[in-house]
């Protein structure tokens, strides 16, 4: 039987298709790609597989204290192959979408995707960290809230990430620090939060990947805050002369019924406001194949 959460997810995501429409941007195109399917960012057939004869790193399950929730929270730390504490590594923080958890990226094979990208393009090895984005000090579940309340609980991860998780990771693992060594990426609602966190904290994050991101970070022209009790707009976060991300990558599936338009609108908004970014559309719906494609291409161009 399909759970009520699946029906809820479909319903609220359908709202995004009609609610997130940026005004005054007709005719805008992405800086790098048109709003058509491209093969430029295609991946090898085995890009998300555990390849035969290839050694992969380990995944640590850790627990850290969160002042935001007043409790211990779990996270997964994905270590690169041959992790050596005498060396230091850049870090990528990974954010899941609605109904996900700290172990979601382990389930969808992020360890293999990242190592394969590093091997295929001779990139620097990275540490990745995934955590539960839903942050509720009251100990509630996602199903307890309507969508506006739910997104506010996702927004609350900001304080958890900045004040608790990142300090814990830097203390317990051999990491490189600074924006030039710290990235953030996510899919769906996690993509929305990744965009916000990167633009809100340019001193912390230098790279952002948004894979089929939910809308709500740019001005819809309605004068209202779109999602979440706090609300935020890129127009308030990006100021003339302030640092932009070193790399911003946005991808969506050509048949995504929920977030294709919001991804295009993000790209159009960034183009019209002079924010450098990579945007492309690939074959697929709102699904893992699109998100993992985004992660693979993100890993191969950062650091």
Residue ranges of model-derived segments:
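Gram-positive cell-envelope targeting signals
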Residues: 1-37
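Non-catalytic cap/lid and distal C-terminal segments of serine-dependent acyl enzymes
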Residues: 29-303
């Amino acid at each position: 039987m399909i759970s009520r959460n699946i029906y809820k997810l479909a319903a609220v995501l359908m709202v995004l298709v009609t609610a997130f429409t940026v005004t005054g941007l007709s005719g805008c195109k992405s800086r790098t790609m048109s709003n058509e399917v491209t093969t430029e960012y295609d991946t090898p057939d085995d890009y998300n597989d555990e390849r035969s004869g290839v050694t992969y790193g380990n995944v640590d399950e850790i627990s850290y204290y969160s002042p935001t929730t007043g409790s211990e929270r779990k996270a997964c730390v994905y270590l690169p192959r041959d992790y050596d504490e005498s060396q230091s590594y850049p870090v990528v923080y990974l954010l899941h979408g609605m109904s996900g958890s700290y172990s979601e990226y382990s389930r969808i094979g992020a360890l293999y995707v990242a190592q394969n990208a590093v091997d295929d393009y001779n990139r620097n090895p990275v540490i990745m960290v995934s955590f539960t984005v839903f942050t509720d000090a009251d100990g509630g579940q996602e199903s307890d809230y309507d969508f506006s309340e739910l997104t506010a609980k996702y927004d609350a991860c900001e304080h958890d990430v900045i004040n608790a998780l990142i300090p814990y990771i830097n203390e317990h693992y051999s990491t490189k620090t600074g924006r030039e060594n710290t990235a953030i990426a996510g899919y769906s609602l996690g993509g929305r939060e990744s965009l916000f966190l990167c633009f809100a904290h340019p001193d912390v994050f230098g790279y952002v990947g948004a894979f089929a991101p939910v809308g709500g970070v740019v001005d819809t022209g309605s004068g209202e805050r779109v999602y979440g009790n706090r609300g935020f707009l890129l127009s308030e976060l990006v100021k003339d002369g302030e640092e932009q991300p070193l790399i911003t990558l946005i991808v969506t599936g050509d048949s995504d019924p929920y977030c294709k338009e919001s991804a295009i609108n993000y790209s159009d908004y960034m183009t019209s406001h002079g924010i450098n970014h990579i945007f492309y559309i690939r074959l697929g719906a709102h699904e893992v194949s699109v998100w993992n494609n985004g992660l693979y291409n993100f890993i191969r161009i950062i650091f």
